[in-house]
Amino acid sequence: MDYTAFCKNFFSATNIPVSLLKSGNPVYSALGEVLGLSVTTHWTMFPYRKNPEFCAISPDLEFGRVFIEGTEYDLIVGPAFSVPVTDQLVRQFMKEVAVPLNFRELLTEILCSMPQISHLQFARYLAFLHQCLNGKVVEPNEIF
């Protein structure tokens, strides 16, 4: 499967950012592509406890992770917001992912255009992605 094309199509269909990592190294980033940033920072990936799983930075700033079994790839989904995007959330996100300040206005516009989704809806997206990528069904409530 062409995982990069899959990520691009997911972002295009949902407007929820997604990144593809191979052994913790960025292969694709939807936000990086939109912002015109080269994403080269290595992510230290902790062993997953569940697949898929939540990776929350704060209660209002969530990511999800789907390990693509039998490969070295991880799909990082998000950020996802269950509350309206505020300046504080934008600043927090920029700090967490080291986005330069000169991208703040464009990033704010992008983040504000993303759908606001509940934790349960986000879990449903992760379960769907897990089924698509790994051929396994997981109930959204099992992700919590």
Name each model-derived stretch.
Residues 1-64:
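Structured interaction and signal-relay segments at domain junctions
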Residues 1-3, 10, 77-144:
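Juxtadomain coupling helices with adjacent low-complexity linkers
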Residues 18-20, 75, 129:
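Generic structural hydrophobic/aromatic packing signal, biased to beta-strands
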